[in-house]
Amino acid sequence: MITIIGSGRVGTAAAVIMGLMKLDNKILLIDIVKGLPQGEALDMNHMSSILGLDVEYVGSNEYKDIEGSDLIIVTAGLPRKPGMTREQLLEANAKIVAEIGREIKKYAPDSIVILTTNPLDAMTYVMWKATGFPRERVIGFSGVLDAGRLAFYAAKKLGISPASILPIVLGQHGESMFPVPSKSYVHGVPLSKLLTEEQLKEVVEETVKAGARITELRGFSSNWGPGAGLAIMAEAVKRDAKRALIASVVLQGEYGVRDVPVEVPIILGRSGVVKVLEVELTEEERQKFMQSVEAVKKLVASVPPSYLQ
């Protein structure tokens, strides 16, 4: 059973896409708002019936119902509003994530957790501490979205399909994340050789500011991109795909970093993170990466200790 905690725009988008991909025959929606997950589940069941899908959606306000879940997606948290930085969300969302983490530990101690709550990397750390799970089973969703955005903007410049690009984005999911054009390839040729310096600068800027741009345009943050990315990650777990993708995980010596979650390439399968892939970086790229690590460290250091137990 797949459980999605949080029945807002991202959670419901993920639920719909996962159902269309037939990743499980039961998808549980959890939310603290009475009636919300039940109503969403009923609507999705009608969709499932119309499309002939063998997928049952169930809505609940009780954490005890997550028992038996092998994969839990956490999208709960305060939304990012126009002009708000991810850092401003820290304290309020740390409390929410810590509470959810304790419930997961109680009712689904063998599950794999993927979360989207911002600021993402710091919340991944909070979830890791709150559950007490191995780092392989607590994964921050961000990199699939960031990499997808990089591929989209680069493909527009090149006039090719985004599917032709293997993108790499590293560091913090936020203002200090950095796409790596020298390690992002089109059939073995790096983007840094296919695009001019000015084009690369534009692609990187568009990628970094994409989330804020969506919020600015429509007044609320992205949901379809994250929903699709979550479904891709869920597929890797449920089908043991051993898929290479970008995600935020707690590093344990990789890149010379310990006990800090940041976006890096991983191999994802049924057991969670199978392997963290270490990309060879130039000195300049290494400096940018470490700047991101330091930014995450500062956020983690500002989380109240009571949320890390």
Swiss-Prot record:
One of its GO terms (molecular function) is L-malate dehydrogenase (NAD+) activity. The active site is at 173 (proton acceptor). InterPro entries: L-lactate/malate_DH, Lactate/malate_DH_C, Lactate/malate_DH_N, Lactate_DH/Glyco_Ohase_4_C, Malate_DH_type3, NAD(P)-bd_dom_sf. It comes from the Archaea. Keywords: NAD, Oxidoreductase, Tricarboxylic acid cycle. CDD domains: LDH-like_MDH. One of its GO terms (biological process) is tricarboxylic acid cycle. One of its GO terms (cellular component) is cytoplasm. Substrate binds at residues 80, 86, 118, 149. NAD(+) binds at residues 6-11, 31, 93, 116-118. It is an enzyme of class 1 (oxidoreductase). Its EC number is 1.1.1.37. It catalyses: (S)-malate + NAD(+) = oxaloacetate + NADH + H(+). The keyword Oxidoreductase applies. Belongs to the LDH/MDH superfamily. Catalyzes the reversible oxidation of malate to oxaloacetate. This is Malate dehydrogenase. It comes from Pyrobaculum aerophilum (strain ATCC 51768 / DSM 7523 / JCM 9630 / CIP 104966 / NBRC 100827 / IM2). The lineage of its organism: Archaea, Thermoproteota, Thermoprotei, Thermoproteales, Thermoproteaceae. The gene is mdh.
